[in-house]
Amino acid sequence: MGAMAMVEQEGCVENRQPLAASSSSVSDGSSYGGGGGGLAQMSPPVSSSANSISGLRRTSGPIRRAKGGWTPEEDETLRKAVEAYKGRNWKKIAECFPYRTEVQCLHRWQKVLNPELIKGPWTQEEDDQIIDLVKKYGPTKWSVIAKALPGRIGKQCRERWHNHLNPEIRKDAWTTEEEQALINAHRIYGNKWAEIAKVLPGRTDNSIKNHWNSSLRKKQDMYNTSNNMVVPKLLVHDKFKDKPKLMAMEGHLDLNKAPIINSKDQPGTAHRSNCSGFLSRSSLPTAQPLTSREASVVDGSAVTLVAQALESDSVRGKGLEIDSVHEKGLEVNSAPDHTGNSWTIQLEAAPSKGEAELSLKNEARSLGPLCYQIPNMEDVVPVSSSLFSDHLTGNHTSEHCGDDILSPAGCTTPPPTKGKLTSQLSVDSILKSAANSFPGTPSILKRRKRDKSTPVSASEMKISGSNTDRFYTPMGMEPATATPESFKTTSFLSLGSLDGSVKSFDVSPQYRARSKRMALTKTVEKQLDFSSDGLDTCGSEILNSSCNNSQSTLSITEAPKLKEKEHAVQLENLTKNFAHTTNLDVT
């Protein structure tokens, strides 16, 4: 057994020397396999090669460690060495690998190559068992705790506890103070997350590393030199003479719309720019309290902000100087540069509401017909209503004429009314007025206008009195005839002349003439049906009314004859109208 151990040791020494490994015929696996005779025959060359290069080996100093990854050949050699030594003597196992230590071999076997190692996710039973064991042994004896968890090593249990199971771990969102502390600690320690975790209680090194790499490292460019991570809000006090205003981010004036900047040697140019629309409070330099000459400016205005920004030391160092500050703006002058040129900026404050309205009125008179003023809702008056005729044509006419602006085309802009209406009109009255004046209302829907000024006596209610009735047609007012069928054919006559004499109402194209005539024929047929259905009732009522008003002496026996006669006349008239319409459609 002693000879066998000596041969194995010599084989491992040979593997530690690259020159011996290339010259010797003994393979790495020869020391773990084969019979004793084979090893005995190969032992003399191994010992001679080891003695020949023993002087090249270092006898002192630290052991060189391989920094590269493990190759498949090294993994296979490690498996055989662990199997030979039963995984107990790691110092002898490490002697079989050049530039590998026993710690490297042990970790490689425990973390990677061990077939009993569990690399999957943690189960709830394992987490509960770790929590119970930590309560019993404390968060230090991880090798003892790992023995209770088959397939897990002490390092896995420790990382599971410190990164996930520890109740002191903070899993909420990162605060501003924590991020600022992380930035400061990273400047000191770099990527030493365990050291940084000591500065941030409740945050694990793993969570710190993830938060830094995911989001916080990208925000470093936005931090200023004063290490203020979050831009403070603008604080505006009532009296800025006593308390300074905290402005955000020391830098330059951020003007979204660049002002017009001209040099002083160019006369005749206006140095104006509106500062109310492009001043950005979030990017003004850190300002100092203003002097007494700027104290008259209104607090919180845009001019105040610009004046404070230009009074700061960072801006004064660039040769900028405030020439004058007033309520409507300020003037900034620059020192001459190396070329001898300087420039001036005049920043004007936003005008008040009254000044803006006055300027708009002045511009309206100067622009002439190019200006249009939008009327208010309470000033809009329905043109078609007759109730507003006095309001539009009364005393206000002279006032409106003074405000009207004639355009080159002869059109005028309607001026707004000077005052509101004194009488509030109801919705019904406005709708009725609009309906009566609507030109597209069909005449069949219009009511007959009756003279209701004086009551009609019973003696005047005769058939001849019906001549005072009127109905609307496209040709104008038409008198009503005394016959009952005239009332039934009123809507038919209101459709217009059938001979085509009136051309002003026919706006349809010629290809639609037939369809229009067919629709007219259908309308007449419907009216004939309606007239024949209500002929008896309507005719009897008119007949009785005329007989009673004229005090006729017709007897009861003559009434049926008169009724038949009137019925025949009505049918004849309606038949003529229908025949005329049919002939028109055929033509």
From Swiss-Prot:
Superkingdom assignment: Eukaryota
Induction: Induced by cold, drought and salt stresses.
DNA-binding annotation, residue ranges on this chain: 90-113, 142-165, 193-216
Pfam families in alphabetical order: Myb_DNA-binding
Matching SUPFAM superfamilies: Homeodomain-like
Tissue specificity note: Expressed in roots, leaves, stems and spikes.
InterPro entries found in the cross-reference section: Homeodomain-like_sf, Myb_dom, MYB_TF, SANT/Myb, SANT_dom
Annotated segments matching region Disordered: 14-74, 441-461
Keyword Transcription belongs to the record: yes
Record localization: Nucleus
Domain HTH myb-type: 62-113, 114-169, 170-220
Any one GO cellular component localisation term in the record: nucleus
Alphabetical keyword list: DNA-binding, Nucleus, Repeat, Stress response, Transcription, Transcription regulation
Major site of localization recorded for this protein: nucleus
Biased amino acid composition, Low complexity: 43-54
One BP annotation, GO: response to cold
Function: Transcription factor involved in abiotic stress responses. May play a regulatory role in tolerance to salt, cold, and drought stresses. Transcriptional activator that binds specifically to a mitosis-specific activator cis-element 5'-(T/C)C(T/C)AACGG(T/C)(T/C)A-3', found in promoters of cyclin genes such as CYCB1-1 and KNOLLE (AC Q84R43). Positively regulates a subset of G2/M phase-specific genes, including CYCB1-1, CYCB2-1, CYCB2-2, and CDC20.1 in response to cold treatment.
Note: Plants over-expressing MYB3R-2 show increased tolerance to freezing. Plants over-expressing MYB3R-2 show retarded growth, increased tolerance to cold, drought and salt stresses, and have decreased sensitivity to seed germination inhibition by abscisic acid (ABA) or salt.
Record's protein name: Transcription factor MYB3R-2
Organism of derivation: Oryza sativa subsp. japonica
Name of the encoding gene: MYB3R-2
